[in-house]
Amino acid sequence: AVAKLLAAADVTAALEGCKADDSFNHKVFFQKTGLAKKSNEELEAIFKILDQDKSGFIEDEELELFLQNFSAGARTLTKTETETFLKAGDSDGDGKIGVDEFQKLVKA
């Protein structure tokens, strides 16, 4: 799981900060969890966990379940949050986020 690569207290704090629907902000989440400080290699390992169907991309269905990769009991992202997250990360406009796009998004 992703949580093994991050400090538990940081993950808990980040999840607490986005419990309410439409309160998820990927930049804040990446900062609070410590993801923003990870190396590209570590981010690639995390990407592979998030890419649940192993397609080489994170699609909207996987983004919707994003928080559950950090804690099984976390909520799903709303449609608005998922669309905003996808738009922020999908720099080539193909409707999904590749590993390079994910690394850039986390470090942005």
Swiss-Prot record:
GO terms for molecular function: calcium ion binding. The modification N-acetylalanine is found at A1. The keyword Acetylation applies. GO terms for cellular component: cytoplasm. Keywords: Acetylation, Calcium, Metal-binding, Muscle protein, Repeat. Transmembrane segments: none annotated. SMART domains: EFh. Belongs to the parvalbumin family. This is Parvalbumin beta.
